[in-house]
């Protein structure tokens, strides 16, 4: 089963023919965890907030996971805390991450978690061996017989149907909530990778800080995230109509509720430090890249992840580093889909399979 250099619909068809329905691909993210399960000629997809509610006195005692736990963020009684098991793409709490993964696998298997043979989990490209083993151990504790961790960038390339087996090269820019990966792929393997431990979460926090500074109003992180989604943009030469959105917070002067208007320029200002770091990382990758690979990635670079939806981003990248990029049509799920494809074909990443894929 050759999965490399095929379009997404062709890959899905091969998964269907093999009947590999007891496998899951998981994008274990800082903000959201996405599960992809082959179903017929497509994928069943499940998006789960990466939030766990636990007892304050015993953080290993899990009370809720996912949407229910997310609703508790900032609203819990004194004896309960709602937390994110991952920070900057790295597991902060083994027990809480295990609860999240069990919940995700349960969703993906329609409550038949014991039937899962294999899961493949996408994680940041610069994860240490200790971090990789932690994810593998958690997956096995959660009930999977076989667990493989792969770079989110490589997984995204596979999920997007990029021709990763070709020698010319492709590049994926994966902009997550906690971290961002820039991955260069040739002959089915990673030739270079640069990870920055910044992402959409940092933009949200910067929005909160800027609203405090400008309006003397404290808004919650959810309001900041909504503003980013509604009017998000980055500074670029692109012609973008300025827009505004309302947010409700607490006046720092009166402690009363107060509505403020957040405009797209404020979001662009909040995003600027993260965009600058991304551009610097891209410049480093291009500096290390051979002329042969540069000619390949020039027309085969895709941007995925939630932050890719900021207007003006593709124009800004081209202005700064001279590489035209395409924003994925399905930026939030390609990592999970790619992981599901690898789960359906465990040998897909072995060198001899990569070489065979070229013939």
Say what each PLM segment does:
Residues 1-172, 185-301, 308-335, 340-359:
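Nucleotide/phosphate-binding catalytic cleft detector across ATP-hydrolyzing
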């Amino acid at each position: 089963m050759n999965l490399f250099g095929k379009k997404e619909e062709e890959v899905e068809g091969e998964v269907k023919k093999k009947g590999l329905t007891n496998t899951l691909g998981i994008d274990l993210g800082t903000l959201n965890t996405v599960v992809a399960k082959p179903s017929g000629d497509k994928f069943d997809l499940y998006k789960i907030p990466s939030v766990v509610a636990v007892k304050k006195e015993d953080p290993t005692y899990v009370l809720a996971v996912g949407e229910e736990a997310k609703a508790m963020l900032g609203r819990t009684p004194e004896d309960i805390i709602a937390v994110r098991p991952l920070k900057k793409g790295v597991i902060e709490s083994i027990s809480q991450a295990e609860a999240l993964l069990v919940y995700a696998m349960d969703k993906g298997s329609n409550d038949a978690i014991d039937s899962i043979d294999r899961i493949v989990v996408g994680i940041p490209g610069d994860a240490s061996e200790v971090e990789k083993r932690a994810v593998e151990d958690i997956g096995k504790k959660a009930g999977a017989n076989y667990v493989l961790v792969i770079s989110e960038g490589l997984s995204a390339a596979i999920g997007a149907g990029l021709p990763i087996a070709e020698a010319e090269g492709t590049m994926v820019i994966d902009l997550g909530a906690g971290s961002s990966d820039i991955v260069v792929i040739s002959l089915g393997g990673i030739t270079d990778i640069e990870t920055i431990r910044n992402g959409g979460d940092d933009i949200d926090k910067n929005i909160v800080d800027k609203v405090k500074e400008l309006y003397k109003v404290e808004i919650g992180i959810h309001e900041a995230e909504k503003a980013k989604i509604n009017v998000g943009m980055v500074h670029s030469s692109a012609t973008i109509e300025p827009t505004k959105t309302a947010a409700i917070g607490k006046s720092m002067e009166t402690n009363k509720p107060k509505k403020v208007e957040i405009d797209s320029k404020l979001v662009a200002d909040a995003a600027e430090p993260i965009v600058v770091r991304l551009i610097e990382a891209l410049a480093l990758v291009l500096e290390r890249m051979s002329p042969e690979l540069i000619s390949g990635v020039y027309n085969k670079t895709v941007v995925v992840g939630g932050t890719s939806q900021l207007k003006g981003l593709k124009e800004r990248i081209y202005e700064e580093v001279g590489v035209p990029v395409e924003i994925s049509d399905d930026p939030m799920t390609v990592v999970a889909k790619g992981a599901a494809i690898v789960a359906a074909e465990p040998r897909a990443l072995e060198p001899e399979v990569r070489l065979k894929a070229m013939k």
